[in-house]
Amino acid sequence: MSESKREHVILIVEDEDAIRLTLRDYLLKKGYTVLVASDGVGAIKQLIDHQVDLIVTDYRMDILGGDYWIKFLDKYCTDQKVLITSGFLRPEFPIPFDVLYKPFDYSDLESMIAERLADTGSS
């Protein structure tokens, strides 16, 4: 396992248990340190308690999801790298972060994560 991956902390924010836990297990096997939250409120707690390198978040969640969650991330997490996953959003929607559309292949997710973590800029 790559030491550089282990040093990266990824926060997965996903309200569907099966998806959240599958993503967690996949990224753990790839060597990342992974935190999870089931909604935006839980994610805020994780962000307060831990240093996070990348947020991988669903767009549509019942509790603090959707446009309010995106606005929160854009306003209060300006130095945070964020990747949105969604089966709901369309390319024409104005989202200030990169979006990976569901259903997606895990290798595409892994590539996008690696690109964001290698990028020295934000978002």
Can you name each region flagged by the protein language model?
Residues 36-45, 66:
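Helix N-cap/capping motif at the beta->alpha junctions
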Residues 58:
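Active-site residues of response regulator receiver
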Residues 102:
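A Lys-centered signature of the CheY-like receiver
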Residues 16-35, 106:
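Two-component/phosphorelay signaling modules centered on CheY-like receiver
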Residues 84-86:
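Hydrophobic/aromatic residues positioned on beta-strands within the core alpha/beta folds
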Residues 45, 67-78:
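Short amphipathic alpha-helix used as the core "switch/output" element in two-component signaling
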Residues 20, 62-63:
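The feature encodes the CheY-like receiver
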Residues 1-9, 105-123:
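Non-catalytic signal-transmission and effector/linker regions of two-component phosphorelay proteins
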